[in-house]
Amino acid sequence: MGMKRKKISIIGAGFTGATTAFILAQKELGDIVLVDIPQLENPTKGKALDMLESSPVLGFDANIIGTSDYADTADSDVVVITAGIARKPGMSRDDLVTTNQGIMKAVTKEVVKYSPNCFIIVLTNPVDAMTYTVFKESGFPKNRVIGQSGVLDTARFRTFVAQELNLSVKDITGFVLGGHGDDMVPLVRYSYAGGIPLETLIPKERLDAIVERTRKGGGEIVNLLGNGSAYYAPAASLAEMVEAIVKDQRRVLPAIAYLEGEYGYEGIYLGVPTILGGNGIEKVIELELTEEEKAALAKSVESVKNVMKVLQ
């Protein structure tokens, strides 16, 4: 048997899906299959071809195709799900639940049929509940179904901190726990600039303001765009997770993982620090939390559970 490139399928060829495909191709992480509904097959093929035609200039080797036929995704190593309706201004993530749950179930059936051994990364909002839906529908083990929110939330937090301190974002590390939404819990105690705790560098009221802006980061962009939601940073975050799995990097990354007792919670998907590598979620890292952080996390869990009550 000859060596084969990895195969990564992206379900949903909207702004986020297409941007993810473009980043993955440039990183040469594998061949890319971009999938959308039959009515959008031609535009999807057009996007894929346009990206492919950039490869001689950007200097990457990757085959990129657009399709509406899941047979083209057969034997994918990683499948990224971005399909679903997007949030409009004034709409909460929860309004999306029922529509997107139906989409998740339909997509998951096809994914499992053609790629029974793949890893699935879910981006569709409300992401904690949608990841749970995909997990249940797929019958996959918990390590192979992962949600993306923490990498993005942490990226926003790190961006704002770097701006505040006028430092390189590369030197800023941070962690965000909990649900993806207004109840996320940025763990300032575990956040550093070049190994120096942020609390020693930024006054408390400024840090609180950064935390607040991070919580509302998605909404800030929704309001500015006026139509649609963020896609560059979400796509970059998905690509980082795909890379960790495909290259077996064993990265410490926040991800939405299925909890079985960690942090005192059972049977839900929640954003936690994980080790992400060739086996997907290889470990959930349990951090010591203060009473205040535990209370904030409990509130976050409550929000996730409230959304899950809406699930059919």
From Swiss-Prot:
| Segment forming the signal sequence | none
Keywords linked to the UniProt accession:
NAD, Oxidoreductase, Phosphoprotein, Tricarboxylic acid cycle
Reaction(s) the record says it catalyses: (S)-malate + NAD(+) = oxaloacetate + NADH + H(+)
- Chain positions with Phosphoserine modification: 149
- Entry's InterPro entries? L-lactate/malate_DH, Lactate/malate_DH_C, Lactate/malate_DH_N, Lactate_DH/Glyco_Ohase_4_C, Malate_DH_type3, NAD(P)-bd_dom_sf
MF-aspect GO terms: L-lactate dehydrogenase activity; L-malate dehydrogenase (NAD+) activity
State the EC number(s): 1.1.1.37
Which residues of this protein are catalytic?
Answer: 180
- List ligand-binding residues for substrate: 87, 93, 125, 156
Mind telling me which Pfam families this protein's record contains? Answer: Ldh_1_C, Ldh_1_N
Q: Which cysteines are joined by disulfide bonds?
A: none
Which GO BP terms, alphabetically? lactate metabolic process; tricarboxylic acid cycle
- Which residues hold NAD(+)? 12-17, 36, 100, 123-125
What's this protein's family per the entry? Belongs to the LDH/MDH superfamily. MDH type 3 family.
Query: What does the UniProt function comment say about this protein?
Result: Catalyzes the reversible oxidation of malate to oxaloacetate.
* Annotated protein name in UniProt: Malate dehydrogenase
Q: Which organism is it from?
A: Anoxybacillus flavithermus (strain DSM 21510 / WK1)
